[in-house]
Amino acid sequence: FRSEKSLPTEVEDKILSIINETPEVRNPHNLCTRRIGNDFAIEVHIRVDGQITVSRAHELTKEIESKLRLKFGPATHIVLHVEPIKEKKDE
């Protein structure tokens, strides 16, 4: 049995940097990364204004997914969990 390792810190930092390029998204957190064969798997929680529509939240996740796949490859597995901004520290 071999435990999964996270991607290198510099890769995780780049992932967070790409996510933070989206102005409506705040406080990416709970980042989990790993390699699946030659591809990357990325799971992360993001916060958005709780008043935006589900459609807009979906658009934002698609934009972020596109940017991440452009950087890390089209087979990158991405899970974005969207949460509402709930405290000042999230802004």
What residues fall within each predicted segment?
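Alpha-helical transmembrane segments and adjacent TM-loop junctions that form the membrane-embedded core
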Residues: F1-E91
